[in-house]
């Protein structure tokens, strides 16, 4: 941490990691967006809420505002950096409770120009059957999307869930 990885001569791309911009901000004025761009990375991974419960309770936002934050954050980073991955935080929890909204968040990221959608089992509590069914639904709804998976191992199922995806 704190080293200039580019100076190491690695051939991998270095991506900055951060959240979507804050509600009420413009991307040009948002400290998170400016931090991501200012790091001068090869691209960015931006995480955003896909679980309606977290949008409304943790962020205190309405669902449409969250969609706009995702779309606008991705679009800004795409314009500034080129490569953008959208990390769909708590995707499988959101899909379980409100599948249409979780999918709409992914659509907003695609509309913003996301190069990849990373589906996250952020609390590590999903079962392989649930992960497989949700990934199939995403692939059906967004057939052109390049998908990735990010599974936590809280329940010892990260490998099984990754294979199910």
What kind of feature is each model-predicted range?
Residues 2-9, 22-147, 163-165:
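Alpha/beta enzyme core
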Residues 13-17:
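A glycine-rich helix N-cap at a beta->alpha junction
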């Amino acid at each position: 941490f704190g080293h200039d990885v580019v100076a190491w001569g690695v051939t991998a791309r270095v991506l900055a990691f951060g959240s979507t911009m804050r509600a009420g901000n413009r991307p040009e004025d948002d400290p998170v967006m400016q931090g991501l761009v200012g790091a001068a990375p090869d691209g960015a991974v931006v995480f955003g809420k896909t679980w309606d419960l977290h949008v409304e309770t943790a962020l205190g936002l309405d669902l449409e505002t969250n969609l706009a934050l995702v779309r606008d954050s991705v679009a800004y980073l795409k314009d500034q950096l080129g490569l953008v991955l959208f990390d769909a935080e708590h995707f499988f929890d959101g899909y379980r409770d409100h599948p249409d909204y979780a999918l709409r968040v992914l659509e907003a990221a695609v509309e913003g120009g996301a190069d990849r959608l990373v589906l996250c089992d952020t609390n590590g509590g999903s079962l392989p059957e649930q992960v497989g069914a949700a990934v199939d639904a995403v692939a059906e709804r967004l057939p052109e999307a390049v998908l990735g998976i990010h599974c936590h191992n809280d329940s010892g199922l990260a490998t099984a869930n990754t294979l199910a995806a």
